[in-house]
Amino acid sequence: MFYARTYTAGQGYQYSETNQLILNFKIRYDDIKRNPQRRQYKQRAIQQFAKEVTALLRDQLDPSLSLILVPIPPSKERSHPEYDDRVEQVVKAVAANIHTVSWLPLLQVTTSMESYHSRSAGRNPEDIYAVLQLDEASAKYCQPNSIIALVDDVLTSGAHFTAARRRIQERFPDTTVIGIFWAKAVSYGVSSET
């Protein structure tokens, strides 16, 4: 798993540049409706995430390999009014910048859930796995032995990654699945090195 930054959970946007970027990235569309000026902050965060993933892949990806980016879906179904395609926007931008990188909306949630960053309950990979399914229209483009990078904004417990990787590897057991996260979450006062 790769991550570029450290996000300090429980701290506000003023705590660090990363906290500000992550919180802007997570601005909800209903918040933007109430305050349209916030859209620019969300868009800048999306662009910055895409820029950093592009730089990482240009630096680390063997140019002879192809990579499929798969956004880990948000907690809401596509038809839900609070559905947010922010991670999808990131992977689209990255794929547009690197010719050996493509993207697929390979995963979707079947039931909308409360977003995990707003819940007090823990993250359970089994609960997440139960509502994840493969998008069959996208699955037909996966080749055996593909390299898939699951992309998400913050790695907290790894529950979403674990559930998503399991769902993909059930169908495509010879596929290599890695994770790319913009940031790893740490608790306030805990070093990111631990």
Model-found features: residue ranges?
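Active-site-facing substrate-recognition patch
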Residues: 1-64, 75-84, 92, 108-144
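Structural motif
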Residues: 66-69, 147-149
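Conserved beta-strand scaffold positions in the cores of enzyme catalytic domains, especially
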Residues: 69, 100-106, 177-179
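Generic recognition of short, well-ordered alpha-helical segments
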Residues: 82-85, 89, 159-163
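Glycine-rich phosphate-binding loop and adjoining helix at the ATP-binding site
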Residues: 84-103
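PRPP/pyrophosphate-binding module of the type I phosphoribosyltransferase fold
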Residues: 116-194
